[in-house]
């Protein structure tokens, strides 16, 4: 058995962590580019052969082991559109999104100069096209919102072992999905959530 002293010493050195098994962490950059005196949001269209093909998103991706979220966002932006990390001015950490499918997405709002934007080199394996959309559009226009109700239905669970009935009422929730449309470009889901929060 542990003594009181041993327990105190153990917990003095104990480092708390979020209890998130099999959890994935991502980071995105929300790039702002000033052109003709107006600030624009830089968005990507995902390549047709990768996951979520054709969706509109920010530069970003999975965080490598031991990598700070901001460094991951800058690295992904460099890999996807060729802008050196030294030419990206991070203005602030944006919102953090916690998804129902075991993932967390960090966001960082940054400014990219018009000169750097002019030297962009698209990585075609990941990005099909780039868009510049006036920031004022998101400030002045609310997205459409669709609500999707979700619930847990666990059939293969040891109900007898934990002492609850098979018709146990698991937690339910409602997912609110925003959708923007600008000049034929449809932006929805997590990208739209970040934009709606930032512009509001």
Language-model segment annotations:
Residues 143-145:
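Short aromatic-enriched loop/helix-cap "lid" or pocket-rim segments at secondary-structure transitions
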Residues 123-125:
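Phosphate/pyrophosphate-binding betaalpha-module
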Residues 127-132:
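Flexible glycine-rich active-site/ligand-binding loops centered on an Asp-His dyad
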Residues 1-57, 62-79, 83-119, 136, ...:
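N-terminal leader/linker segments that precede catalytic domains of diphosphate-processing enzymes
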